[in-house]
């Protein structure tokens, strides 16, 4: 039995979102073809995700100096504990599905905050004499990303930073088996938006069977 962590980063309702609609189609098909697997849904806009702030840096610093967790301030304890909880949840999964829109050539800021909680030295990667080494080997990920324009090819290709950044981070922590479903062109070709979504849904369903 595999554990799937389904991560969404979109404040919209599912029926209003291209990425969430495609993501839901993927998830329901996955459940049908992998009924024994455990699926955990994490919606970052409905979840407490601490930002890396002064309390977090202060708490980490005290722990590195040998202070007990109980000696941290209340805010430091709460934020550090929550970050550890999110990181542990991520580490326990075998497969990951990220569902995001493209905002200003990248993804929503709440996802960046979440990514900061899963990139922890000693947990998801470690430093060695040869450089950093990712510790999450043998796992796989899928990124479903909605883009209003066309970014897979053409002059705007180099302006797509969300999928490329996510792939870089996942590779850094050891996850190199990553696929992407790009739902793109809905704003550039509004008359074709529904057809674009349906094509992406069919691709997502097909991928769910073998993911």
Curated annotation (Swiss-Prot):
Its cofactor is FMN. The keyword Ubl conjugation does not apply. It catalyses: 2 a quinone + NADH + H(+) = 2 a 1,4-benzosemiquinone + NAD(+); N,N-dimethyl-1,4-phenylenediamine + anthranilate + 2 NAD(+) = 2-(4-dimethylaminophenyl)diazenylbenzoate + 2 NADH + 2 H(+). Keywords: Flavoprotein, FMN, NAD, Oxidoreductase. It is an enzyme of class 1 (oxidoreductase). One of its GO terms (molecular function) is oxidoreductase activity, acting on NAD(P)H, quinone or similar compound as acceptor. Binds 1 FMN per subunit. FMN binds at residues 17-19, 102-105. Gene3D superfamilies: 3.40.50.360. InterPro entries: Flavodoxin_fold (IPR003680), Flavoprotein-like_sf (IPR029039), FMN-dep_NADH:Q_OxRdtase_AzoR1 (IPR050104), NADH:quinone_OxRdtase_FMN_depd (IPR023048). Its EC number is 1.6.5.-, 1.7.1.17. Pfam families: Flavodoxin_2. Quinone reductase that provides resistance to thiol-specific stress caused by electrophilic quinones. NCBIfam families: PRK13556.1. Belongs to the azoreductase type 1 family. Homodimer. This is FMN-dependent NADH:quinone oxidoreductase. It comes from Anoxybacillus flavithermus (strain DSM 21510 / WK1).
């Amino acid at each position: 039995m595999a554990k799937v962590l389904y991560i969404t980063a979109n404040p919209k309702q599912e029926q209003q979102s291209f990425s969430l609609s495609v993501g839901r189609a993927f998830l329901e098909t996955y459940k049908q073809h992998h009924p024994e697997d455990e699926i955990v849904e994490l919606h970052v806009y409905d979840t407490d995700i601490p930002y890396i702030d002064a309390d977090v840096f202060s708490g980490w610093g005290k722990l590195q100096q040998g202070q007990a967790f109980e000696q941290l301030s209340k805010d430091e304890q709460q934020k550090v504990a929550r970050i550890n909880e999110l990181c542990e949840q991520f580490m326990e999964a075998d497969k990951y599905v990220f569902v995001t829109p493209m905002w200003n050539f990248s993804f929503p800021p709440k996802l960046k905050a979440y990514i900061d909680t899963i990139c922890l030295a000693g947990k998801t990667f470690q430093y060695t004499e040869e450089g950093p080494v990712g510790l999450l080997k043998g796992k796989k990920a899928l990124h479903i990303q909605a883009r209003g324009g066309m970014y897979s090819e053409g002059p705007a290709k180099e302006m797509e930073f969300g999928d490329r950044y996510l792939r870089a981070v996942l590779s850094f922590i050891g996850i190199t088996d990553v696929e992407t479903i790009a739902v793109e062109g809905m704003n550039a070709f509004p008359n074709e938006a529904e057809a674009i979504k349906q094509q992406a849904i069919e691709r997502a369903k097909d991928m769910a069977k073998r993911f």
